Amino acid sequence: MNINLVGIGLGNPELLTKAACNAISKSDIVIGAKRIVDSIRSDFVGKKFFLEYNTEKIADIIKSNAGSEISVIFSGDISLFSGGSKLFERLKAFKNCKINTFPGISSLSYLCAKTNIDISKVKILSFHGKDELLYHNIDSNEYTFIITSKGEGAKEICRKLISFGFFELDITLGENLSYDNERITTAKPGDFLDMDISDLNCMIIYNPDSDKAISFGLHDEVFARDKVPITKSEVRAVILSKLNISSDSICYDIGAGSGSVSIEMAGLAYEGKVYAVEKNPVAVELIKKNIHNFNAENIELI
């Protein structure tokens, strides 16, 4: 049984690769989400189409049609935030199943090509149905590509950038890429707030002042302190070096005080989580201030 996992690109049939066209043409059955199927249906007359995007339900359809050649189609490229990866793993359990993969043009490669940006310089994020730590990624990368969740999702990212103080960064927003109504706009975060943004969108944020350096032992004076004791800079530096915190570590700061250790933990564990535990009401307010001042999105105050 041949199963083809096909990336069809962004929706314009003209961007479908020749190999992908041949795979779909040879298939008896084509499975995919409605928007994706609708974009190619007229070019592949006579195929049996199933409108489905759930991995397990697709697997059931494949089981029920074991004697057929089947193409499962996905938007963009099957290697970038695609259900193709999950389905590939699921199909490994099938006996006598040959899995063929066909890459497509992704929104990332398309937008980078349109704007002359080297993909190798780009940090890739997705806010489509999940949260990411925005501040650190923008602060430490020259280019950040984001797949957003609908038009309002793009505006929410712009609001966050403004709250972080990133007023002057250039954002390139791509809408309805490859379609006749494609629009690519470069502007500041505030300029997008009153725009009518398509739900099919992605963006690249350019930060020419990005800083990839990660350090610890910040000067004591940079923290909000009041009368709450603070772990001194030199002590903090030794503690953090001994902890050997990685980017995805889960950290606990018990008796967090002013939150200086928590803040520095959060900078090191920028893809992880820091739990700052404190019972002193004055200290709790200081921790809140420091979280705000350092845009430490990955700290949870307990």
Residue locations for each model-derived region?
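A contiguous loop/helix-start segment that scaffolds small-molecule binding in enzyme catalytic cores
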Residues: 2-5, 69-70, 143-228
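Short, well-ordered alpha-helix to beta-strand connector turns
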Residues: 24-28, 45, 141-142, 200, ...
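Short, glycine-/small-residue-rich phosphate/pyrophosphate-handling segment
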Residues: 107-140, 149, 153
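Conserved SAM-binding loop of SAM-dependent methyltransferases across substrates and taxa
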Residues: 258-270
